[in-house]
Amino acid sequence: MATIKDVAKMAGVSTTTVSHVINKTRFVAAETEKLVLQAIQELNYSPSAVARSLKVNTTKSIGMIVTSSEAPYFAEIIHAVEEHCYRQGYSLFLCNTQNNVEKIKNHLEMLIKKRVDGILVMCAEYTQDSLDLLANFTSLPLVVMDWGPDNKHTDIIQDHSFEGGYLATKYLIDHGHKDIGIIAGELTKTTAKTRYEGFIKAMNEAGLKINPDWVMEGFFEPEDGYECMNKILAQDTLPTAVFCCNDVMALGAISAIGEKGLRVPEDISIIGYDNIHASRFYSPPLTTIHQSKSRLGARAVTLLFERINEKSEERAVIEMHPELVIRKSVKSRL
């Protein structure tokens, strides 16, 4: 691998001159610059990112720690983060944790060794062990996005999931549905719990009974939607509509309904949550609750850049208000 000394020798100049050409830190005669650039091209020389970072105290890179980059909702946020980084001339190191505290610790240590300029942590929930661990890593700018209760270590995402759960359920009620089931997430998790509470409020306001046989709990995966829907379909009486608390569980539910020879929305209406990109291509296209993944990703990165440039540590609140997206998976029963 070629070094700066090799470039200097081929061009017949000093290593200092080569450095000035690369970094544009001083005027260099056009003919000399041409010789240096030709040598760089012929030798396929690439400056050491680590060496440059030690000089200018920046690597133009950030780390991002997420629970899982496979989940469509997080994947769309990650895409927005990467695009925003690219436009700012930054590279992104992506680390998956599966909510494993040891992996979070190892990833944080690795990113610090790589001298990233800042770290973005975006998980759906945090254990106390994770929060205590993050509190110890204050040596560089850190933005911790948290959907959970107020915590002194974290920024806060107020996604108004209660409002979204209420909005989804009320839409079903307003279209004449009275027998409504729900496939919720894990109800020990803040996001799942608040969406479920929004469902309860809408049902209670309308004076509708909640059938416990139609209340299911999953883990926000398509398999959970499929299995939970099959349990509902095994009951003696069926709901006319089901609120799935994310779009991928809705996909599993639609698959289970089809396998039983029933149709969406003619026999059972389905409404989802998140408005992931694929939801418009479901069969039928999914009526769902929208949350802006691109705005969240851009806002999180902007906040991190502010901390990098201004050394600000003030906690931030990012608000996301849910919106109804009407497609073709809900039938009117009026």
Swiss-Prot record:
Q: Which Pfam families match?
A: LacI, Peripla_BP_3
Subunit structure of this chain's protein? Homodimer.
**Protein function:** Is the main repressor of the genes involved in the de novo synthesis of purine nucleotides, regulating purB, purC, purEK, purF, purHD, purL, purMN and guaBA expression. PurR is allosterically activated to bind its cognate DNA by binding the purine corepressors, hypoxanthine or guanine, thereby effecting transcription repression.
Q: Which GO terms describe its molecular function?
A: DNA-binding transcription factor activity; transcription cis-regulatory region binding
> Highest taxon of the source?
Bacteria
| Domain HTH lacI-type span(s) in chain numbering | 2-56
One of the GO biological process terms: negative regulation of DNA-templated transcription
Highest classification ranks of the organism: Bacteria, Pseudomonadati, Pseudomonadota, Gammaproteobacteria, Pasteurellales
Query: Can you say what this protein is called?
Result: HTH-type transcriptional repressor PurR
Q: Which positions bind hypoxanthine?
A: 73, 189, 191, 220, 274
- Matching PROSITE patterns, A to Z? HTH_LACI_1, HTH_LACI_2
InterPro entries from the UniProt entry: HTH_LacI, LacI/GalR-like_sensor, Lambda_DNA-bd_dom_sf, Peripla_BP_I, Tscrpt_reg_HTH_PurR
The entry's free-text remark on domains says: Consists of two structural and functional domains: an N-terminal DNA-binding domain, approximately the first 60 residues, and a larger C-terminal domain, approximately 280 residues, which imparts the function of corepressor binding and oligomerization.
Print the keywords alphabetically. DNA-binding, Purine biosynthesis, Repressor, Transcription, Transcription regulation
Q: In which pathway does it act?
A: Purine metabolism; purine nucleotide biosynthesis [regulation]
HAMAP family annotated for this entry? HTH_type_PurR
Report the SMART domains cross-referenced here.
HTH_LACI (SM00354)
Q: Which residues bind DNA?
A: 4-23, 48-56
